Curated annotation (Swiss-Prot):
Pfam family, one: tRNA_Me_trans_C
Name the UniProt record assigns to this protein: tRNA-specific 2-thiouridylase MnmA
Any single GO BP term: tRNA wobble position uridine thiolation
EC numbers: 2.8.1.13
Organism whose genome encodes this protein: Geobacter metallireducens (strain ATCC 53774 / DSM 7210 / GS-15)
Keywords of this entry: ATP-binding, Cytoplasm, Disulfide bond, Nucleotide-binding, RNA-binding, Transferase, tRNA processing, tRNA-binding
Origin: domain of life: Bacteria
Gene Ontology CC terms, in alphabetical order: cytoplasm
Major location (coarse): cytoplasm
Subcellular location, record wording: Cytoplasm
Length: 368
């Protein structure tokens, strides 16, 4: 590698196999690599069962793993404490959304407000040319000089959904070395590099709710016994009572605690009225949605476009028509009705493999 091609690159290291391989690959290519882990949460508040570890990223054990990998491959390593910022920018938003009757996606918020904002700023302070992460997504620069955000090549691991808020300025300073690889290929590289984390399991839970008990977490943050009220159907008939609207999400069937001759699902949550609205499976279907805080990776030249959209991470993209509205809003009409359109989740728009942009689901449309 020529000195001109050699770059100083900060790698966001979580202690997992993906970010570890990212760092090792860039070091092998001849770049000047600096590893950084983010301390975002006080894990002393939780204790895993004896002999077990939580399936999260960013715990103290994970930071220790990242430090050992950095030592192994011979790169400097730092820990930045973003606990205060993470509480304000991610956790408070997470709690607020649940108490508004919505179901948030904190991983998108973390990418948007912490990883590709605060950590990217820290990388620039260190004189880095680029920030690298282990995300399974790709960035390509077009002939027009603009950066295009694309799906990762591994369809089972593609994480482009979580990255829709990235701007042109951010994409110019970010790299995703694993975007063209599959997970098995990444593990093979980890083995070739001799990394201790080669067989480390996947992080499954939200990092600040390591036991996956959302209700306990929310009540620890805001107190129990709030937003208690009625379970009703669409007509307003009272079918039962609940212990807090934040315990429910659209599509939920279990835990309703009401007897009914037919299966009932949560079809809406009205925190203002303290009501959980239930109905048969058919009432989960919606012809479209309205999204707010919509952003575009590349500015649109039209007010209406045909695209495919995902309304949750594991959702298969479906054809839709997007109409841009005033105030960074958009109306999304599906070609066929979709199930469980959930306020608070992200809707992300695609054209083939390319991420066009996305926003936050504000409401499901009810008319045909």
């Amino acid at each position: 590698m020529t000195e001109k091609a050699r770059k100083r690159i900060v790698v966001a290291m979580s202690g997992g196999v993906d970010s570890s391989v990212t760092a090792a690959l860039l070091k092998e290519e001849g770049h000047e690599v600096i590893g950084i882990s983010m301390q975002v949460w006080d894990y002393s508040k939780f204790s895993a069962p004896e002999g077990e570890k939580f399936d999260t990223c960013c715990s103290l054990d994970d930071i220790h793993d990242a430090r050992r990998v950095a030592e192994q491959i011979g790169i400097p390593f730092y820990v930045v404490n973003f606990e205060e910022e993470f509480q304000r920018l991610v956790i408070d938003d997470f709690v607020d959304e649940y108490f508004r009757g919505r179901t948030p996606n904190p991983c998108v918020r973390c990418n948007q407000r912490v990883k590709f904002e605060l950590l990217l700023r820290k990388a620039r302070e260190l004189g880095a040319d680029l920030l690298a992460t282990g995300h399974y997504a790709r960035i390509e620069r077009g002939g027009d000089g603009l950066f295009h955000l694309l799906r990762g090549d591994d369809p089972g691991k593609d994480q482009s959904y979580f990255l829709f808020t990235l701007t042109q300025e951010q994409l110019a300073r970010v790299t995703f070395p694993l975007g063209g690889m599959t997970k098995p290929e990444v593990r093979q590289l980890a083995t070739r590099f001799g990394l201790r984390v080669a067989e480390k399991g996947e992080s499954q839970e939200i990092c600040f709710v390591p036991d996956n008990d959302y209700v306990r977490f929310l009540e620890d943050e805001r107190g129990a016994g709030q937003l208690v009220g009625e379970i009703v159907d669409r007509a307003g008939t009272v079918l039962g009572h609940h212990e807090g609207t934040y315990r429910y999400t659209v599509g939920q069937r279990r835990g309703l605690g009401i007897a009914h001759p037919h299966p009932l699902y949560v079809v809406g949550v009205d925190a203002e009225r303290r009501q959980v609205i239930v109905g048969p499976k058919e009432e989960l279907l919606a012809p479209g949605l309205v999204a707010t805080d919509v952003t575009w990776v590349i500015a649109l030249a039209t007010e209406t476009l045909e695209a495919a959209c995902k309304i949750r991470y594991r959702h298969h993209p479906v054809p839709c028509t997007v109409t841009v509205l005033a105030g960074n809003r958009a109306q999304v009409r599906f070609r066929e009705p979709e199930k469980s359109v959930t306020p608070g989740q992200a809707v992300v728009f695609y054209h083939g493999d390319e991420v066009l942009g996305g926003g936050w689901i504000d409401a499901a449309m009810t008319e045909g």
